[in-house]
């Protein structure tokens, strides 16, 4: 059992089962995660493991970060992330988290930054239907329609679905299946799509919800 791991989305491909079925999979490159800090309830108020992955030029590492990595005796990585440790499993600073902790058939939750779409209208952003293309409709074909009432309440309620920035947000896709674990090449093949663009960092954790497929 593992608390999770940080990887990099490489892209999508497909593999074939023994029955000849084509299964779309996302390839996630998971280099060993180096543990830079172990947080506990007694000292930090919560239990977590701080990890880094990849590499970074020394000129791009600030002095506080350099001291932090030196204390843990690990190489500076491209990012630093935390994984909550609610299982009570024991970890040591300087240790490694690897793909060996996962197994084929396991369900996982994958968190990443979704693709940024920029400023988008309500049709693209929220799947609103378009208004009539003709029959007296002018310049309102992709408009949202009414956004509220009149003098009472005299305002637009918070959370009203309107045009705005779409994507580039933290997204989690739940209950994805690990199809294959390639320990030699540090790869995880996960069924279906995971959030984000190729090259983006993703966090892979054991699924928190169990789905009954029966």
Curated annotation (Swiss-Prot):
Post-translational modifications: Methylated by PrmB.
GO biological process, one term: translation
Cellular compartments per GO CC: cytosolic large ribosomal subunit
Keywords of this entry: Methylation, Ribonucleoprotein, Ribosomal protein, RNA-binding, rRNA-binding
Highest taxon above the source species: Bacteria
A GO molecular-function descriptor: rRNA binding
Gene3D superfamilies tied to this protein: 3.30.160.810, Translation factors
Pfam families: Ribosomal_L3
UniProt modified residues of type N5-methylglutamine: 151
InterPro entries per record: Ribosomal_uL3 (IPR000597), Ribosomal_uL3_bac/org-type (IPR019927), Ribosomal_uL3_CS (IPR019926), Transl_B-barrel_sf (IPR009000)
PROSITE patterns: RIBOSOMAL_L3
TM region positions: none
Function as written in the Swiss-Prot or TrEMBL entry: One of the primary rRNA binding proteins, it binds directly near the 3'-end of the 23S rRNA, where it nucleates assembly of the 50S subunit.
Subunit structure: Part of the 50S ribosomal subunit. Forms a cluster with proteins L14 and L19.
Family stated for the protein in its record: Belongs to the universal ribosomal protein uL3 family.
Record's protein name: Large ribosomal subunit protein uL3
Organism field: Saccharophagus degradans (strain 2-40 / ATCC 43961 / DSM 17024)
Organismal lineage: Bacteria, Pseudomonadati, Pseudomonadota, Gammaproteobacteria, Cellvibrionales
